[in-house]
């Protein structure tokens, strides 16, 4: 299996800052522990195997846990989606979303109407 490039805590904070600068809102981390937890979830493993089985599930883990943990003062959904997409891009996966399905999907993810597994399926469909 090809080595997977995961996002670091610093990179996710930079992604958040970029989202706020481009689209507005308040900068700041509301809870560093929740942010650290969210960023760690995609690469959690047990007995030498990742709990998230592929890149799409790992990307969905970034999106889901950043949305659910709400670690930033503002821009959590934007940061969640951007982190998932950047993670995929870093690992050679391009997503094409000409109809804007991901914006709606991340709002549904944050509200609990879409779960992590469903979000991973959406990402797979848009590759």
Predicted regions and their residues:
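FIC/Doc superfamily catalytic core
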Residues: 1-127
């Amino acid at each position: 299996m090809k080595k997977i490039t995961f996002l670091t805590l610093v990179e996710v904070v930079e992604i958040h800052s970029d989202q706020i600068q481009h689209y507005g809102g308040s900068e700041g981390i509301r809870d560093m522990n929740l942010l650290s937890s969210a960023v760690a979830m995609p690469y959690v493993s047990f007995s030498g195997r990742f709990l998230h089985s592929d890149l799409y599930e790992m990307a969905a883990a970034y999106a889901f846990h950043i949305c659910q943990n709400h670690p930033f003062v503002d821009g959590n959904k934007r940061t969640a989606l951007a982190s998932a997409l950047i993670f995929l891009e870093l690992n050679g996966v391009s997503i094409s979303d000409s109809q804007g399905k991901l914006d709606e999907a991340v709002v549904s993810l944050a509200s609990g109407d879409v779960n992590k597994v469903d979000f991973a399926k959406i990402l797979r469909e848009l590759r």
